[in-house]
């Protein structure tokens, strides 16, 4: 599902809100989440999951085009950990 598909679906389900209002709310929510992660803080949405930053240590990688070794710097990457309710709903699909 893309962001525009999500906006369309939410606007359909929430008839009191226009698609523009839903779009503004989603954009603001995503902006706030990005700002929070940018400061190194964690985001927890109970039942859904949590977003945090994980550190990837420096390592030696490989350029897939040339095959040469490349030194990669350490960096922080966004990480999502699904909550218990979300895991259970997804597991129910698989059974």
Swiss-Prot record:
Domain of life where this protein originates: Bacteria
Descriptive protein name: Integration host factor subunit beta
InterPro entries: Hist_DNA-bd (IPR000119), Histone-like_DNA-bd_CS (IPR020816), IHF-like_DNA-bd_dom_sf (IPR010992), IHF_beta (IPR005685)
BP GO annotations: DNA recombination; regulation of DNA-templated transcription; regulation of translation
Gene Ontology MF terms in the entry: DNA binding; structural constituent of chromatin
Pfam families (alphabetical): Bac_DNA_binding (PF00216)
Record note on quaternary structure: Heterodimer of an alpha and a beta chain.
Family named by the database record: Belongs to the bacterial histone-like protein family.
GO cellular component: chromosome; cytosol
Keywords for this protein: DNA recombination, DNA-binding, Transcription, Transcription regulation, Translation regulation
Summary of the function given for this chain in its UniProt record: This protein is one of the two subunits of integration host factor, a specific DNA-binding protein that functions in genetic recombination as well as in transcriptional and translational control.
Originating gene: ihfB
NCBIfam families documented for this protein: hip, PRK00199.1
HAMAP family the UniProt entry points to: IHF_beta
